[in-house]
Amino acid sequence: LAHGALFNTAGRAYRVTEEVARAAAEFEKCRSLLTGSEVRSKIAIHYSSTAVINSVNAPLLKNYDYRSTLIDRVHAAFRHYNVDVIETNHALDGYDVLFSPFLSTVDEKGLKERVIEWVKAGGTWVVGPMSDIMTEYSSKYTNAPYSFLEELAGVYTKYELPVANEEYRAKWAGGEGTFAISTCYSAYELKGAEALAVYENGEFAGMPVITQHRVGKGKVILLGTLPEADVLRSFSGSAPILPASDNLVLTARSGSGNAIIAVETENKSGVLVLDGAYKEMLSGRTLEGSVSVAPYEVLVLVKE
């Protein structure tokens, strides 16, 4: 063998060999907790293999990569939440909020019918930008920009601008506060929906960019652009697991035992703010208040 993950060709261990052994020992410490609990998510984000293919076959945005955009601009916004990443054939039962950004093909694998029924039953579908704009064969629709989304969202798409700039901003409709928007821009006319946010400036100034439409017991929130992380989080309708710096990923587990797992992922120090006293299972320490987290450190926290 020219390469081995744990031992070199002379049979000598690498540094990573010790790290793997340490990780195995730490998993053993947490065995009962991990086997007796699970991650329960009320939020899901769509990631579509068809959208990957569409972005390659028929690219619509300059310097756009579907995977990195979802990871860095959408999923990263929910580092402090329990969130599932699902394909379009995945069941929607059990979720309260579904994000479908850049989901170029929605009408596949029965998703169109299932998501409509899920919304009618009380779900919140945060869809867009640039969702429902292509068939599964990477072709555009000819009767409208979307296959069905205009009707479901209660809008008419007046303008589309798939060219990013750093000048456009949006403001909340009927309230104060502006926020950054990016990547692409659609402007809508309302056909039953209400405007949540409008363009603050530019040629679309005053036109709706984010809308909301009640459908049955649920609602469809249509994004005509990609807003900043705080705005995305506001549509989840829930609070983070705990306050923490952006380089920490938090996961809450529940079952016969409850725990919060914090992982530093960027090789720099972070801060986690605890809402009480917690036992850290790997080190045996009791932690409370503002806790410093070392680069690549893992904390397994059980509330005392």
Q: In which residue ranges do the predicted regions lie?
A:
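Carbohydrate-binding surfaces of carbohydrate-active enzymes
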Residues: 1-304
